[in-house]
Regions:
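Positively charged n-region of N-terminal signal peptides that target proteins for export
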Residues: 1-6
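Short N-terminal segments immediately surrounding and downstream of signal-peptide cleavage
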Residues: 24-40
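Helix-loop module immediately N-terminal to the HCX5R catalytic loop
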Residues: 73-101, 217-248
């Protein structure tokens, strides 16, 4: 009996120490079959983050429209930032999302739009929600499977959700400046951008953060824009030198693309210690004390 109690206590400590919400009630990534089977669950909120006109043309039955642009906003000179706390709370409330809701974020497709869905999902998790998922393959996967669509406008009653910010999901500039030479950084952008052959106009420097490891976000997806098997993602990350025991920081140009890696590593794989840098290259490249590196691997 004493041994059993000791083992139980050890198991609980392991779960608590993992940093992963073991109370999660839904998978971090759901497929069409799962979503169809759960459409009538009263806990479910299907959050359609496509453009309003796309939603009106047809959507998953019961889905609520909440355009992506409301979840990633311009703040001063920076693009695609987390909304101010009061705006974020109001946004969640207006979608009818409660603390115990099962939220499935739906974009137009997987592939090039996958990180739009994960950006919203990451923001919801950052806000304190536990049961959030993204639809693998997006709305395109739903229609390709021949599932029912609706044109009925859905408006849920506003909730009374209150924020419970998880600061350890976010890396800000101060955190980055303190840890740039000590923690592993994952660059989610393309090879060409990482090496400095190309860059976006609003990013002041070419290349990548000193010491950052290149892992384009597209590597987690197959030719149809759906997730590759979990084992392949773990194999890839391990081969690149990342491990579950490390604290990892992901970044890209604006904090959108890197949310895909954050979501997959933290929520899908269950690695507990990872942050997403919302300001990303757009912010850090403006700092004269940081010199980006070009045409080298690290």
């Amino acid at each position: 009996m004493r041994l059993s109690r000791a083992l139980l206590a050890m198991f609980i400590l392991i779960l608590l120490g993992s940093g992963v919400a073991f109370a999660r009630e839904i998978p971090a990534v759901v497929d069409v079959a799962w979503l169809e089977a759960n459409l009538n669950n009263p806990k479910l909120v299907v959050l359609d983050v496509r453009k309003a006109e796309d939603y009106k043309a047809g959507h998953i039955p019961g889905a609520v429209s909440s355009f992506f642009g409301s979840w990633a906003v311009k703040k001063g000179p920076l693009n695609a930032e987390i909304p101010e706390p009061e705006d974020l709370q109001e946004l969640i409330q207006s979608a009818g999302i409660q603390a115990g809701s099962w939220v499935v974020v739906v974009e137009s497709e997987g592939g090039p739009r996958f990180h739009f869905a994960t950006r919203v999902a990451w923001t919801l998790a950052y806000a304190g929600l536990d049961h959030v998922a993204v639809l693998d393959g997006g709305y395109a996967a739903w229609t390709k499977a021949g599932k029912t669509v609706s044109t009925e406008m859905v408006k849920k009653p506003a909730s009374k959700f209150t924020l419970n910010i998880r600061k350890d999901y976010l890396a800000d500039k101060n955190f980055v400046l303190k840890t740039l030479n000590t923690l592993p950084y994952l660059d989610a952008r393309s090879y060409d951008t990482y090496f400095g052959r190309t860059k976006l106009p609003f990013v002041a420097q070419e290349g990548h953060f000193p010491g950052a490891i290149s892992a384009p976000k597209e590597w987690m997806l197959d030719a149809e824009g759906k997730l590759v098997p979990k084992a392949k993602i773990e194999e890839l990350l391990t081969a690149l030198g990342f491990s579950e025991s490390q604290e990892i920081v992901t970044y890209c140009d604006t904090g959108m693309g890197c949310s895909a890696w954050w979501w997959i590593i933290h929520e899908y794989l269950g690695w507990p210690k990872i942050r997403s840098y919302d300001g990303s290259s757009e912010e850090l490249a403006k700092d004269p004390t940081v010199k980006f590196r070009k045409y080298v691997w690290r």
